């Protein structure tokens, strides 16, 4: 087999994309940067955009009170609550963001307890996948309003780092929060029962 070698100038051998990149240095980037994983870390969470006036006004129009709006730290945090479609109300004398998608009559597969029965006993209801609804302190202070979130909304997709500043010591006393959770769910159960008596649910 005979191989012929043709001389090629350096310019002809360079691909057109490389030439374009060379002519537009301000619009190119190091390809190695694309391989680096992107994710919100505790170290870069301070770069999150703060809650804008526009978002604050929108949430206020949706009924969010100042106690909740003042506790929301960033646009990303507000987006978590909006995407969860939480509604503002008062629970146990404190502002809260509650879920509207809880099936109070849904029973768990193990004990046959309904979500409403669980709540009456001070335990969290279960979501559609059978996972416990979690409570989050908006603003991470003991007196902060609470938000009802699924585990995924609370901790997945970078939400854990958006919602929790782990670079400082938590102000939440876990034992006190355990009692607060129990009282919260009992109060929510009472609200649901009252609404049912009034014919609203």
Task: Tell where the protein language model's regions lie, with residue ranges.
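Nuclease and nuclease-like effector domains acting on nucleic acids or nucleotide cofactors
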Residues: 2-133, 139-201
